[in-house]
Amino acid sequence: ALKNGADYAFDPLEKDFAKKVIEVSKGGVNTAVEVTGVGAGLNETLDCMAKLGRVALLGCTRISDFTVDYYSKVHFPGISLIGAHTHARAELESSHGNYTHIDDIKAILRLCANNRLTLCDVVKETHQPSECEEVYQRLINDKNFPVGVQFDWKGEW
């Protein structure tokens, strides 16, 4: 994270994680992206938020066997939860806070051009398309599945 431009990096499993985040951010973060799709991850993210903060729910939280204290973690501090499924976005017309797929691609390219993001460091595995079923099963079942897994579509498949 630090190599890709993050100002700080903390282990969410460490004691007092939320307290550390609130301390360095001087009262909590304004924006967070929850990527795990795990209820405990959402709860921990909410614990790190500043008043009127926004949380993008990028992780696919399809398991409903967790609880959130919505009053103290969402309603009282005025937190906005934003569903980040790409099908919910405008296709062509972006507006403040509502960006298109093309807007996201341009933002990623700007981050790369300014050395704030190095995609080569993100890619951990490359597979042939013929391996897609095996890779997908790992994605579903392996809690340690790497973030950067890609398919090589150039070869014969």
Each language-model region and where it sits:
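C-terminal capping/lid region of NAD(P)-dependent oxidoreductase domains
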Residues: 29-31, 56, 63, 67, ...
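C-terminal substrate-binding/catalytic core of Rossmann-like NAD(P)-dependent dehydrogenases/reductases
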Residues: 18, 22, 26, 69-123, ...
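Helix-to-beta-strand junctions that scaffold the AdoMet/dcAdoMet cofactor pocket
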Residues: 49-51
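Short glycine-rich, flexible loops that bind phosphorylated cofactors or substrates
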Residues: 40-41, 63-65, 89
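Adenosine-nucleotide cofactor-binding segment
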Residues: 1-44
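Short strand-turn motif at the edge of the Rossmann-like AdoMet-binding core
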Residues: 36, 59-62, 85-87
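Short, glycine/polar-rich helix-capping loops at beta-to-alpha or helix-loop-helix junctions
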Residues: 2, 66-70
